[in-house]
Amino acid sequence: MKAIQFDASKPLDLIPLGRATIDLNPIDYYKPLDECVTFKRYLGGSPANIAVGLARLGKKVGFIGKVSNDQFGKYIIDYFANEGVDVSHVTRCQGGQRLALTFTEILNENESSIMMYRDAIADLMLSVEDIDEAYIQSAKALLISGTSLCASPSREAALKAVALARKNGVPVVFDIDYREYRWQSADEIALYYHAVAEQADIILGSREEYDLTMALLAPGLDDAGTAAYWHGHKAKIVVIKHGKQGSPPIPATASITASSLSR
């Protein structure tokens, strides 16, 4: 089994890169959004929640991201700081971009959906100038969210961060984290997802996300073939999620299958 080496001398356990947003969830359960009146605000964005979750577990966590230069941007920075997440590389937009918003519609116990507002948003304004090599060097691992790859200049910033992590021996975690917003084509998704996945030590995604990632260069593979394909690159751990159906065993010693969890 290929082992992942984490440098214990590094001060930060993980630096996620990607979106920090606002989620607005209705308190009026089991109604369509047009009938909901009261909403509760939450921190949104997979990389942001990973950062906070690890900080609550006692880990030293940083973050690389862009937020709006307004009260909601202040909310994100203050929230991170209060949770113990290092905010030295969370910067503010100067062009009037706003935080992305996500509304959750909960129709019943088994049916829900989300509505995302992701036009002219702050997190996709992260630029190559925001990527600090010394900061990446300070981490045991770097996590890249796939949503950061959907548009420029965030796309180039993420690619620079991956390149610097590999240069400095920092393991790369790729959370495919697909959202349909802002992508221009299936080929574009496959091109940029594959470019990061082939540099990653750990890859996390659903079956559908792997299919998107591999559509150009290795389409049609099952779970075992998918794991073998990425083990043929740099990946030491491949996680293929199947939601509440769980995941079948993958015959690859360095792979992990994520079964559904009872709540």
Question: For the regions a protein language model found, what residue spans apply to each?
Answer:
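Conserved N-terminal subdomain of the carbohydrate kinase-like
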Residues: 60-144
